[in-house]
Amino acid sequence: MSRQTTIPLRERNIILIGFMGAGKTTIGQLVAKKLYRDFIDVDAEIERRQGMSIPELFAQKGEAYFRKVERELIVDLCTNTRLKILSLGGGAYLQEDVRRACLAHGIVFFLDLSWEHWKEERLPLIVDSRPVLKNKTLEEVEQLFFQRQSAYALHHSRVVLNELEAEQAAEQIVESIKWTWDVYEPNR
């Protein structure tokens, strides 16, 4: 598929962004099931292709290498695939090339939640599994959370997750997508 090709809305990949631990993978799997699409967790795909976990990749090859692999994969998926649900790692969308490809070729949903909710509900579940959090104080993690918000603000739609269960968030995304299809491509 050429970069100049305009992808019909109904065929565009649906891309989920947000801070680590927001629930992108869980919600993405639910959305994929509801829309009968394939689901791709970008971090899991990187692990599969590299033959090692993300923490191992960070330790052995460094963050710069990981970000390069991540960027190349996401840009390729955005420009050369259709009808997928993509879940991006929390830091992926900070890269300009990734943002540009996602916004141009997909429908980007920001899965948002407050710092307080994330700190109380999500941090305890993920703190040991995320290389970016390793050896960071709570204040440093909070700073990282708020630094990323400006990149996440560049999206097509936002879902606030604070009080939503994953199923409710997925349903909200699906309803939003279907409404968009009906309004902008009613005869397809």
From Swiss-Prot:
Chief location bin: cytoplasm
Enzyme class: transferase
EC identifiers of the protein: 2.7.1.71
Source species, domain of life: Bacteria
Cofactor note: Binds 1 Mg(2+) ion per subunit.
Residues binding substrate, per UniProt: D43, R67, G90, R148
Annotated binding of ATP, by residue: G21, A22, G23, K24, T25, T26, R130
One family name in Pfam for this protein: SKI
Alphabetical keyword list: Amino-acid biosynthesis, Aromatic amino acid biosynthesis, ATP-binding, Cytoplasm, Kinase, Magnesium, Metal-binding, Nucleotide-binding, Transferase
GO molecular function: ATP binding; magnesium ion binding; shikimate kinase activity
The name this protein goes by in its record: Shikimate kinase
